[in-house]
Protein backbone atom coordinates (compact mmCIF):
# COMPACT_ATOMS: atom_id res chain seq x y z
CA UNK A 1 0.00 0.00 0.00
CA UNK A 2 1.29 3.46 -0.92
CA UNK A 3 2.24 5.60 2.07
CA UNK A 4 0.59 9.02 2.01
CA UNK A 5 2.20 11.57 4.35
CA UNK A 6 -1.01 13.59 4.55
CA UNK A 7 -2.93 10.57 5.87
CA UNK A 8 -0.31 10.00 8.55
CA UNK A 9 -0.47 13.70 9.49
CA UNK A 10 -4.27 13.47 9.70
CA UNK A 11 -3.97 10.63 12.21
CA UNK A 12 -1.59 12.69 14.35
CA UNK A 13 -3.94 15.68 14.11
CA UNK A 14 -6.98 13.63 15.10
CA UNK A 15 -5.17 11.66 17.82
CA UNK A 16 -5.92 8.43 16.00
CA UNK A 17 -3.90 5.29 16.80
CA UNK A 18 -0.50 5.40 15.07
CA UNK A 19 1.29 2.49 13.45
CA UNK A 20 4.99 2.69 14.38
CA UNK A 21 5.83 1.51 10.85
CA UNK A 22 4.09 4.63 9.50
CA UNK A 23 6.24 6.81 11.78
CA UNK A 24 9.32 5.20 10.25
CA UNK A 25 7.97 5.69 6.71
CA UNK A 26 7.30 9.36 7.38
CA UNK A 27 10.88 9.91 8.60
CA UNK A 28 12.24 7.99 5.61
CA UNK A 29 10.29 10.38 3.39
CA UNK A 30 11.75 13.36 5.25
CA UNK A 31 15.27 12.05 4.64
CA UNK A 32 14.65 11.25 0.97
CA UNK A 33 12.96 14.60 0.29
CA UNK A 34 9.63 12.96 -0.56
CA UNK A 35 7.93 14.72 2.37
CA UNK A 36 7.64 18.45 1.76
CA UNK A 37 8.52 21.22 4.21
CA UNK A 38 4.82 22.06 4.38
CA UNK A 39 4.04 18.50 5.44
CA UNK A 40 6.84 18.55 8.03
CA UNK A 41 5.40 21.80 9.39
CA UNK A 42 1.89 20.32 9.56
CA UNK A 43 3.22 17.23 11.33
CA UNK A 44 5.19 19.34 13.82
CA UNK A 45 2.18 21.52 14.63
CA UNK A 46 -0.08 18.48 15.07
CA UNK A 47 2.46 16.97 17.47
CA UNK A 48 2.85 20.30 19.28
CA UNK A 49 -0.86 20.38 20.11
CA UNK A 50 -1.45 16.66 20.69
CA UNK A 51 1.98 15.20 21.55
CA UNK A 52 2.71 11.56 20.73
CA UNK A 53 2.13 8.40 22.76
CA UNK A 54 5.25 6.73 24.14
CA UNK A 55 5.37 4.04 21.44
CA UNK A 56 5.31 6.68 18.68
CA UNK A 57 7.96 8.79 20.46
CA UNK A 58 10.25 5.77 20.58
CA UNK A 59 9.52 4.98 16.92
CA UNK A 60 10.22 8.59 15.88
CA UNK A 61 13.49 8.61 17.82
CA UNK A 62 14.70 5.34 16.33
CA UNK A 63 13.67 6.37 12.81
CA UNK A 64 15.58 9.65 13.11
CA UNK A 65 18.57 7.71 14.43
CA UNK A 66 18.44 5.36 11.46
CA UNK A 67 18.09 8.18 8.90
CA UNK A 68 21.91 8.40 8.69
CA UNK A 69 25.07 6.80 10.00
CA UNK A 70 24.98 5.05 13.37
CA UNK A 71 28.39 4.83 15.01
CA UNK A 72 29.32 1.34 16.15
CA UNK A 73 32.16 1.36 18.66
CA UNK A 74 32.48 -2.41 18.97
CA UNK A 75 35.31 -2.54 16.43
CA UNK A 76 37.25 0.29 18.06
CA UNK A 77 38.60 -1.95 20.84
CA UNK A 78 37.57 0.47 23.57
CA UNK A 79 38.17 -0.80 27.09
CA UNK A 80 35.29 1.10 28.65
CA UNK A 81 31.64 2.12 28.10
CA UNK A 82 30.48 4.79 25.64
CA UNK A 83 28.53 7.30 27.74
CA UNK A 84 27.34 10.89 27.40
CA UNK A 85 25.45 13.75 29.00
CA UNK A 86 23.17 16.41 27.58
CA UNK A 87 21.71 19.63 28.94
CA UNK A 88 18.59 21.50 27.89
CA UNK A 89 20.73 24.64 28.07
CA UNK A 90 21.05 27.67 30.25
CA UNK A 91 23.38 30.47 31.30
CA UNK A 92 26.91 29.77 32.51
CA UNK A 93 26.35 26.06 31.89
CA UNK A 94 29.82 24.79 31.02
CA UNK A 95 29.35 21.34 32.53
CA UNK A 96 30.14 19.53 29.25
CA UNK A 97 33.64 21.00 29.27
CA UNK A 98 34.42 19.55 32.69
CA UNK A 99 32.26 16.41 32.84
CA UNK A 100 33.60 14.93 29.59
CA UNK A 101 37.26 15.03 30.73
CA UNK A 102 36.38 13.79 34.23
CA UNK A 103 34.49 10.77 32.91
CA UNK A 104 37.16 10.04 30.29
CA UNK A 105 39.82 10.06 33.00
CA UNK A 106 37.73 7.50 34.91
CA UNK A 107 37.68 5.10 31.96
CA UNK A 108 34.60 6.17 30.01
CA UNK A 109 34.47 7.17 26.35
CA UNK A 110 32.46 10.29 25.55
CA UNK A 111 31.52 11.13 21.91
CA UNK A 112 29.59 14.28 22.77
CA UNK A 113 27.49 15.71 19.92
CA UNK A 114 26.81 19.29 20.98
CA UNK A 115 24.99 22.32 19.62
CA UNK A 116 25.25 26.06 19.23
CA UNK A 117 23.56 28.69 21.33
CA UNK A 118 20.32 30.31 20.27
CA UNK A 119 18.34 32.86 22.22
CA UNK A 120 19.60 33.43 25.75
CA UNK A 121 21.31 30.05 26.16
CA UNK A 122 24.98 29.47 25.46
CA UNK A 123 26.13 26.71 23.12
CA UNK A 124 28.97 24.30 23.85
CA UNK A 125 30.23 24.49 20.25
CA UNK A 126 30.43 28.29 20.47
CA UNK A 127 32.53 28.01 23.61
CA UNK A 128 34.93 25.56 21.94
CA UNK A 129 35.22 27.74 18.83
CA UNK A 130 36.72 30.40 21.10
CA UNK A 131 39.78 28.10 21.16
CA UNK A 132 42.01 28.93 18.14
CA UNK A 133 42.18 26.06 15.66
CA UNK A 134 39.65 23.79 17.41
CA UNK A 135 37.70 21.80 14.79
CA UNK A 136 34.08 21.30 15.85
CA UNK A 137 33.23 19.46 12.61
CA UNK A 138 35.75 16.65 12.13
CA UNK A 139 35.15 13.67 9.87
CA UNK A 140 33.59 10.59 11.40
CA UNK A 141 36.96 8.82 11.14
CA UNK A 142 38.65 11.67 13.02
CA UNK A 143 35.89 11.61 15.65
CA UNK A 144 36.53 7.91 16.19
CA UNK A 145 40.30 8.45 16.52
CA UNK A 146 39.98 11.30 19.00
CA UNK A 147 37.48 9.42 21.17
CA UNK A 148 39.72 6.34 21.15
CA UNK A 149 42.92 8.27 21.94
CA UNK A 150 41.69 11.07 24.24
CA UNK A 151 38.62 9.38 25.69
CA UNK A 152 36.34 12.17 24.54
CA UNK A 153 35.50 14.45 21.63
CA UNK A 154 33.07 17.35 21.89
CA UNK A 155 31.94 18.18 18.35
CA UNK A 156 28.93 19.24 16.31
CA UNK A 157 26.33 17.17 14.50
CA UNK A 158 27.69 15.97 11.17
CA UNK A 159 25.60 15.77 8.02
CA UNK A 160 25.72 11.99 8.31
CA UNK A 161 24.30 11.73 11.85
CA UNK A 162 20.48 11.90 12.13
CA UNK A 163 19.93 14.03 8.98
CA UNK A 164 16.14 13.70 9.31
CA UNK A 165 16.34 15.43 12.68
CA UNK A 166 18.30 18.27 11.12
CA UNK A 167 15.61 18.84 8.48
CA UNK A 168 12.73 18.55 10.94
CA UNK A 169 14.40 20.94 13.40
CA UNK A 170 14.99 23.55 10.69
CA UNK A 171 11.23 23.58 10.03
CA UNK A 172 10.33 23.59 13.75
CA UNK A 173 12.59 26.58 14.29
CA UNK A 174 10.53 28.77 11.93
CA UNK A 175 7.04 27.40 12.73
CA UNK A 176 6.79 27.95 16.52
CA UNK A 177 6.95 24.22 17.25
CA UNK A 178 10.34 24.00 18.99
CA UNK A 179 8.75 23.53 22.43
CA UNK A 180 6.99 20.22 21.72
CA UNK A 181 8.11 17.67 24.32
CA UNK A 182 7.74 14.76 21.88
CA UNK A 183 9.85 16.48 19.23
CA UNK A 184 12.48 17.71 21.71
CA UNK A 185 12.80 14.18 23.06
CA UNK A 186 13.26 12.61 19.62
CA UNK A 187 15.70 15.32 18.52
CA UNK A 188 18.00 14.93 21.53
CA UNK A 189 17.92 11.16 21.76
CA UNK A 190 18.21 10.36 18.04
CA UNK A 191 21.58 12.14 17.92
CA UNK A 192 22.82 10.39 21.07
CA UNK A 193 21.74 7.00 19.73
CA UNK A 194 23.36 7.76 16.36
CA UNK A 195 26.60 8.49 18.21
CA UNK A 196 26.53 4.96 19.62
CA UNK A 197 25.99 6.00 23.23
CA UNK A 198 24.98 3.22 25.64
CA UNK A 199 24.13 5.40 28.67
CA UNK A 200 22.98 9.03 28.92
CA UNK A 201 22.80 11.42 31.87
CA UNK A 202 20.30 14.17 31.03
CA UNK A 203 20.39 17.59 32.71
CA UNK A 204 17.00 19.33 32.54
CA UNK A 205 17.05 22.93 33.74
CA UNK A 206 14.36 24.52 35.93
CA UNK A 207 13.96 28.25 36.59
CA UNK A 208 14.17 31.72 35.06
CA UNK A 209 16.98 30.78 32.68
CA UNK A 210 15.58 27.39 31.66
CA UNK A 211 14.46 26.41 28.17
CA UNK A 212 11.08 25.14 29.37
CA UNK A 213 8.88 27.88 30.87
CA UNK A 214 7.68 26.01 33.97
CA UNK A 215 8.94 23.46 36.49
CA UNK A 216 6.06 21.17 35.55
CA UNK A 217 7.02 21.17 31.87
CA UNK A 218 10.69 20.60 32.74
CA UNK A 219 9.71 17.55 34.81
CA UNK A 220 7.47 16.30 31.98
CA UNK A 221 10.35 16.64 29.50
CA UNK A 222 12.70 14.79 31.86
CA UNK A 223 10.22 11.93 32.24
CA UNK A 224 9.74 11.73 28.47
CA UNK A 225 13.48 11.58 27.80
CA UNK A 226 14.02 8.87 30.42
CA UNK A 227 11.13 6.72 29.17
CA UNK A 228 12.02 7.06 25.48
CA UNK A 229 15.76 6.66 26.03
CA UNK A 230 15.30 3.47 28.02
CA UNK A 231 12.64 2.26 25.58
CA UNK A 232 15.08 2.77 22.70
CA UNK A 233 17.73 0.64 24.39
CA UNK A 234 19.93 3.37 25.89
CA UNK A 235 20.15 3.49 29.68
CA UNK A 236 18.94 6.99 30.58
CA UNK A 237 18.50 9.06 33.73
CA UNK A 238 17.57 12.73 34.12
CA UNK A 239 18.44 15.28 36.77
CA UNK A 240 16.38 18.42 37.32
CA UNK A 241 18.79 21.25 38.18
CA UNK A 242 18.35 24.90 39.11
CA UNK A 243 18.67 27.66 36.51
CA UNK A 244 17.34 30.61 38.52
CA UNK A 245 20.84 32.04 38.24
CA UNK A 246 23.89 31.32 36.11
CA UNK A 247 25.33 27.91 36.94
CA UNK A 248 28.92 29.16 36.93
CA UNK A 249 29.76 32.76 37.95
CA UNK A 250 30.46 33.60 34.31
CA UNK A 251 28.78 33.71 30.90
CA UNK A 252 30.38 34.09 27.49
CA UNK A 253 32.39 31.81 25.26
CA UNK A 254 36.10 32.35 25.97
CA UNK A 255 35.27 33.35 29.54
CA UNK A 256 33.52 30.02 30.15
CA UNK A 257 36.40 28.05 28.59
CA UNK A 258 38.75 29.77 31.05
CA UNK A 259 36.34 28.95 33.89
CA UNK A 260 36.33 25.29 32.80
CA UNK A 261 40.12 25.18 32.73
CA UNK A 262 40.25 26.74 36.20
CA UNK A 263 37.81 24.07 37.42
CA UNK A 264 39.82 21.20 35.95
CA UNK A 265 43.15 22.50 37.27
CA UNK A 266 41.77 23.41 40.70
CA UNK A 267 42.35 27.15 40.37
CA UNK A 268 38.63 27.72 41.11
CA UNK A 269 35.74 25.29 41.59
CA UNK A 270 32.46 27.18 42.11
CA UNK A 271 30.14 25.21 44.39
CA UNK A 272 27.05 25.18 42.13
CA UNK A 273 29.04 24.12 39.07
CA UNK A 274 30.73 21.40 41.10
CA UNK A 275 27.44 20.08 42.49
CA UNK A 276 25.81 19.67 39.07
CA UNK A 277 28.97 18.36 37.40
CA UNK A 278 29.51 15.71 40.05
CA UNK A 279 25.84 14.66 40.03
CA UNK A 280 25.80 14.11 36.26
CA UNK A 281 29.28 12.60 35.98
CA UNK A 282 28.49 10.19 38.83
CA UNK A 283 25.37 9.06 36.94
CA UNK A 284 27.48 8.41 33.85
CA UNK A 285 29.97 6.30 35.82
CA UNK A 286 27.34 4.22 37.62
CA UNK A 287 25.18 3.65 34.52
CA UNK A 288 28.31 2.73 32.56
CA UNK A 289 29.46 0.23 35.18
CA UNK A 290 32.58 2.24 36.07
CA UNK A 291 31.51 2.76 39.70
CA UNK A 292 29.62 0.63 42.19
CA UNK A 293 27.41 3.47 43.42
CA UNK A 294 27.22 7.27 43.62
CA UNK A 295 29.66 7.43 46.56
CA UNK A 296 32.24 5.35 44.69
CA UNK A 297 31.71 7.46 41.56
CA UNK A 298 32.26 10.72 43.42
CA UNK A 299 35.43 9.36 45.00
CA UNK A 300 36.79 8.42 41.58
CA UNK A 301 35.83 11.79 40.08
CA UNK A 302 37.50 13.68 42.91
CA UNK A 303 40.66 11.61 42.41
CA UNK A 304 41.00 12.41 38.68
CA UNK A 305 40.49 16.10 39.38
CA UNK A 306 43.08 16.22 42.14
CA UNK A 307 45.63 14.17 40.17
CA UNK A 308 45.33 16.37 37.08
CA UNK A 309 44.17 13.43 34.95
CA UNK A 310 40.91 15.17 33.97
CA UNK A 311 42.73 18.35 32.91
CA UNK A 312 45.14 16.22 30.88
CA UNK A 313 42.22 14.61 29.02
CA UNK A 314 40.81 18.03 28.14
CA UNK A 315 44.23 19.15 26.87
CA UNK A 316 44.59 15.95 24.83
CA UNK A 317 41.19 16.47 23.17
CA UNK A 318 41.90 20.12 22.35
CA UNK A 319 45.25 19.30 20.76
CA UNK A 320 43.84 16.34 18.81
CA UNK A 321 41.13 18.56 17.32
CA UNK A 322 43.55 21.27 16.21
CA UNK A 323 43.74 23.55 19.25
CA UNK A 324 46.87 24.71 21.11
CA UNK A 325 48.77 21.95 22.89
CA UNK A 326 49.46 24.27 25.85
CA UNK A 327 45.95 25.71 26.27
CA UNK A 328 45.53 24.36 29.81
CA UNK A 329 48.93 25.70 30.89
CA UNK A 330 48.59 29.06 29.12
CA UNK A 331 44.93 29.91 28.53
CA UNK A 332 45.62 33.65 28.66
CA UNK A 333 47.97 33.26 25.69
CA UNK A 334 45.36 31.72 23.41
CA UNK A 335 41.85 32.76 24.46
CA UNK A 336 40.59 36.11 23.12
CA UNK A 337 40.14 38.95 25.60
CA UNK A 338 37.65 41.80 25.27
CA UNK A 339 38.96 45.34 24.88
CA UNK A 340 36.78 46.87 27.62
CA UNK A 341 35.80 45.74 31.11
CA UNK A 342 33.31 47.48 33.42
CA UNK A 343 31.97 46.62 36.88
CA UNK A 344 28.20 46.49 37.48
CA UNK A 345 27.63 48.39 40.72
CA UNK A 346 24.73 47.47 43.02
CA UNK A 347 22.21 50.32 43.23
CA UNK A 348 21.47 49.67 46.90
CA UNK A 349 22.56 47.59 49.88
CA UNK A 350 20.75 44.39 50.79
CA UNK A 351 20.39 40.73 49.89
CA UNK A 352 20.21 39.41 46.34
CA UNK A 353 16.72 37.90 46.38
CA UNK A 354 16.15 37.26 42.66
CA UNK A 355 18.20 36.99 39.48
CA UNK A 356 16.69 36.94 35.99
CA UNK A 357 19.06 34.40 34.44
CA UNK A 358 17.44 34.80 31.03
CA UNK A 359 18.20 38.53 31.12
CA UNK A 360 21.85 37.76 31.88
CA UNK A 361 22.00 35.47 28.86
CA UNK A 362 20.40 38.12 26.66
CA UNK A 363 22.94 40.66 27.92
CA UNK A 364 25.68 38.40 26.56
CA UNK A 365 23.80 38.19 23.25
CA UNK A 366 23.60 42.00 23.21
CA UNK A 367 27.36 42.19 23.64
CA UNK A 368 27.80 39.99 20.56
CA UNK A 369 28.54 36.76 22.41
CA UNK A 370 25.33 34.98 21.34
CA UNK A 371 23.01 34.77 18.37
CA UNK A 372 19.88 36.80 17.82
CA UNK A 373 19.37 34.64 14.70
CA UNK A 374 21.07 31.69 13.03
CA UNK A 375 24.09 32.85 11.04
CA UNK A 376 25.10 35.73 13.31
CA UNK A 377 28.86 36.16 13.75
CA UNK A 378 30.02 35.90 17.37
CA UNK A 379 32.55 37.87 19.37
CA UNK A 380 34.07 35.09 21.46
CA UNK A 381 35.80 37.47 23.87
CA UNK A 382 32.76 39.19 25.39
CA UNK A 383 30.61 38.18 28.34
CA UNK A 384 30.22 38.40 32.09
CA UNK A 385 32.42 37.31 34.97
CA UNK A 386 32.39 37.43 38.78
CA UNK A 387 28.58 37.12 38.85
CA UNK A 388 27.16 37.57 42.35
CA UNK A 389 24.89 34.74 43.52
CA UNK A 390 21.43 34.49 45.04
CA UNK A 391 21.47 35.08 48.78
CA UNK A 392 24.64 37.19 48.78
CA UNK A 393 24.75 40.33 50.91
CA UNK A 394 25.92 43.36 48.91
CA UNK A 395 26.58 47.00 49.74
CA UNK A 396 25.62 49.94 47.54
CA UNK A 397 28.25 50.32 44.84
CA UNK A 398 29.62 46.81 45.32
CA UNK A 399 30.13 44.98 41.99
CA UNK A 400 27.42 42.48 41.04
CA UNK A 401 29.42 41.37 37.99
CA UNK A 402 32.06 42.48 35.51
CA UNK A 403 31.07 43.13 31.89
CA UNK A 404 33.60 42.31 29.16
CA UNK A 405 32.80 44.17 25.94
CA UNK A 406 34.28 45.24 22.62
CA UNK A 407 33.93 48.95 23.49
CA UNK A 408 32.75 51.34 26.19
CA UNK A 409 29.32 51.94 24.63
CA UNK A 410 28.33 48.27 24.51
CA UNK A 411 29.77 47.81 28.01
CA UNK A 412 27.50 50.58 29.31
CA UNK A 413 24.40 49.03 27.71
CA UNK A 414 25.20 45.60 29.14
CA UNK A 415 25.93 47.09 32.56
CA UNK A 416 22.41 48.51 32.73
CA UNK A 417 20.88 45.20 31.57
CA UNK A 418 22.80 43.18 34.15
CA UNK A 419 21.91 45.58 36.97
CA UNK A 420 18.20 45.26 36.09
CA UNK A 421 18.52 41.45 36.19
CA UNK A 422 19.32 41.60 39.92
CA UNK A 423 16.67 42.33 42.54
CA UNK A 424 18.03 43.33 45.93
CA UNK A 425 15.80 43.11 49.01
CA UNK A 426 15.95 43.76 52.74
CA UNK A 427 15.87 40.09 53.78
CA UNK A 428 17.87 37.05 52.64
CA UNK A 429 15.86 34.72 50.38
CA UNK A 430 15.14 31.10 51.23
CA UNK A 431 17.96 28.82 50.18
CA UNK A 432 17.30 26.62 47.15
CA UNK A 433 18.97 23.39 46.11
CA UNK A 434 20.91 23.27 42.88
CA UNK A 435 19.90 19.62 42.27
CA UNK A 436 16.11 19.34 42.56
CA UNK A 437 15.36 15.72 41.67
CA UNK A 438 16.60 12.65 39.82
CA UNK A 439 14.31 10.73 37.46
CA UNK A 440 15.25 7.18 36.48
Swiss-Prot record:
PROSITE patterns: THYMID_PHOSPHORYLASE
Name under which the protein is recorded: Thymidine phosphorylase
GO biological processes: pyrimidine nucleobase metabolic process; thymidine metabolic process
Record keywords: Glycosyltransferase, Transferase
Pfam family, any one: Glycos_trans_3N
Residues that span the membrane, as ranges: none
InterPro entries membership: Glycosyl_Trfase_fam3, Glycosyl_Trfase_fam3_N_dom, Glycosyl_Trfase_fam3_N_dom_sf, Nuc_phospho_transferase, PYNP-like_C_sf, PYNP_C, Pyrmidine_PPas_bac/euk, Pyrmidine_PPase_CS
Gene Ontology molecular function: any one: thymidine phosphorylase activity
EC number: 2.4.2.4
Assembly and interaction partners: Homodimer.
Catalytic activities: thymidine + phosphate = 2-deoxy-alpha-D-ribose 1-phosphate + thymine
Taxonomic superkingdom: Bacteria
Gene Ontology CC: cytosol
Enzyme class of the recorded protein, top EC level: transferase
Species this protein is from: Burkholderia pseudomallei (strain 1106a)
Family: Belongs to the thymidine/pyrimidine-nucleoside phosphorylase family.
Function of the molecule: The enzymes which catalyze the reversible phosphorolysis of pyrimidine nucleosides are involved in the degradation of these compounds and in their utilization as carbon and energy sources, or in the rescue of pyrimidine bases for nucleotide synthesis.
Pathway noted in the entry: Pyrimidine metabolism; dTMP biosynthesis via salvage pathway; dTMP from thymine: step 1/2
Amino acid sequence: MTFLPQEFIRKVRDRAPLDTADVARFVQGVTAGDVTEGQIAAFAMAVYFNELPLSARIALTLAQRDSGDVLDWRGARLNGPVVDKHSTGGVGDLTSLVIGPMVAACGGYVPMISGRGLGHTGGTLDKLEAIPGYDVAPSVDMLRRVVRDAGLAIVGQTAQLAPADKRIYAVRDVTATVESISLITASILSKKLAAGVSALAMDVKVGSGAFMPSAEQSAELARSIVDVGNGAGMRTAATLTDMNQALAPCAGNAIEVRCAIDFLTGAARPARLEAVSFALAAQMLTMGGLAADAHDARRRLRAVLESGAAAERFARMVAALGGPADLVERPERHLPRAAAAAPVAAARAGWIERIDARALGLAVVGLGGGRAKIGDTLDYSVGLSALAELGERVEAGQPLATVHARDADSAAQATDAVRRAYRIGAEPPAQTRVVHAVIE
